[in-house]
Amino acid sequence: MSKLITIERHILEQQKNFPEATGELTDLLSDVAFAAKLVRREVVRAGLVDILGFAGSTNVQGEEVKKLDLFANDKIINAIGQHGRFAIMGSEENEEIITPPNNENGSYALLFDPLDGSSNIDVNVSVGTIFSIYKIKNSDPRKADISDCLQKGSEQVAAGYVIYGSSVVMVYTTGNGVHGFTYDPTIGEFLLSHENIVTPKHGKYYSINEGSYAQFNDTTKKYLDYIKEEDSATGRPYSTRYIGSLVADFHRNLLTGGVFVYPPTTNHPNGKLRLMYEGNPLAYICEQAGGRATDGRRRILDIDPSELHQRTPLYIGSEDDVRVAEEFEQGIR
C-alpha cells in the first residue's frame, strides 16, 4: 500500500533540501493550503447558499464582481494575513496593496487571484485560486510597500494554484520541481497524488478563445490556420480544448501537453491576463515542469513589472508548442 503523504508533510520534507531554511516558507504554504480548504467548502456549496450571482460592484479590472469572488478574497486575506507571516499582500480584486495586521515579523509578499474563472461557477465549471510568493526587499517588514510586490517573476520563491473541480487539486513549486495534491474530504487533507510533474515537450491540444478571432492580429490568425492543417509529421491538426477558466485549461495542458494562448487583441493590445496574479505564478510552475512561458517575444519571468495590475499576452505550455506560437507572433513563420 502506498504511503499517504499530506501536503504539510511533503512541504516539510522538501524543506530538508535547503539547510538554510527557517521553516517560515513552509508555514506560509501550509496557510495557503488551509485557506484553499475554506474556499473549497463554499465552492462545493455554491448552488445551495446565497453566494452565486453578482455582488453589485466592479473590481479594479472593471469587471463585475461575483459574490463568491468577494468571499474567496476575504477568506484568503483573513486566513493568511492573521498570522503576520506576510509583510504585504496583493489581490487581483483589490486596487491597492494590502498590509496585514501584525506584519512586523513578515518576510514575504503574497500575490493572488482568489477565484480565477468565477464566471463559470454558476454552471459548475472548474474554477481556481492562483498564488505567488516573493521575499520582500525591504529590511523592515513594517515599511514593506508596492516595490516589494513589483518583482520579476524570476524572483518568486514559491507559486501554485488550487483547482476546484470534480476533485480539488493543489499544485505548487518552490523551485525544486512541481507537485500536486488531491483533497480527500473524508479526512480533510490534501494528499500527494502527482509527484514531480513533468509536462510533455510536445502536445496535441491548443487552448484559445476563438470567439475573439476577428480581434486577433494576422500573425495569430496564421498560427491558428497552421495548427489546424493536416500534417502527420508534426502531429497536426491539433485538437482544441478551451474551458474559459485559465487555471483549468493550464492544468489540463500541464498534465497532457499542449499550449494555452491568450494573444494581444484589438480590444486588449497589451493582453488581458494579469502578469502578477496569473502570468508569473503559472510561468514559474510551467518552467519548473519543463515547459515554456512567454508573451510572444519575452520570457514571462524576465518581464520587469511597473504596475500591480499589469496585463500581458500569454503563450504557455509544452516547450515545442510555445516556440511554434512565438515564431508566428514574431513573424518568423
Swiss-Prot record:
Q: Name one Pfam family in it.
A: FBPase_C
Record's keyword annotation contains Metal-binding: yes
GO biological process terms on file: fructose 1,6-bisphosphate metabolic process; fructose 6-phosphate metabolic process; fructose metabolic process; gluconeogenesis; reductive pentose-phosphate cycle; sucrose biosynthetic process
Q: Which CDD domains match?
A: FBPase
Localisation per UniProt entry: Cytoplasm
Which pathway or pathways does this protein act in? Carbohydrate biosynthesis; Calvin cycle
Residues binding substrate, per UniProt: 116-119, 209, 242, 272
InterPro entries documented for this protein: FBPase_C_dom, FBPase_class-1, FBPase_N, FBPtase
Kindly list the positions annotated as binding Mg(2+) 1.
Answer: 92, 113, 115
Q: What class of enzyme is it?
A: hydrolase
Q: How is the co-factor bound, per the entry?
A: Binds 2 magnesium ions per subunit.
A single Gene Ontology CC annotation of this entry is: cytosol
EC numbers for this chain: 3.1.3.11
Q: Which cofactor does it need?
A: Mg(2+)
Q: Could you tell me the keywords of this UniProt record?
A: Calvin cycle, Carbohydrate metabolism, Cytoplasm, Hydrolase, Magnesium, Metal-binding
The primary location reported for this protein is cytoplasm
MF GO annotations: fructose 1,6-bisphosphate 1-phosphatase activity; magnesium ion binding
Positions contributing to Mg(2+) 2 binding: 113, 116, 278
Q: Which reaction does it catalyse?
A: beta-D-fructose 1,6-bisphosphate + H2O = beta-D-fructose 6-phosphate + phosphate
| Homology family | Belongs to the FBPase class 1 family.
Q: How does it assemble?
A: Homotetramer.
Protein name from the UniProt record: Fructose-1,6-bisphosphatase class 1
| Lineage, highest ranks first | Bacteria, Pseudomonadati, Chlorobiota, Chlorobiia, Chlorobiales
Q: State the encoding gene.
A: fbp
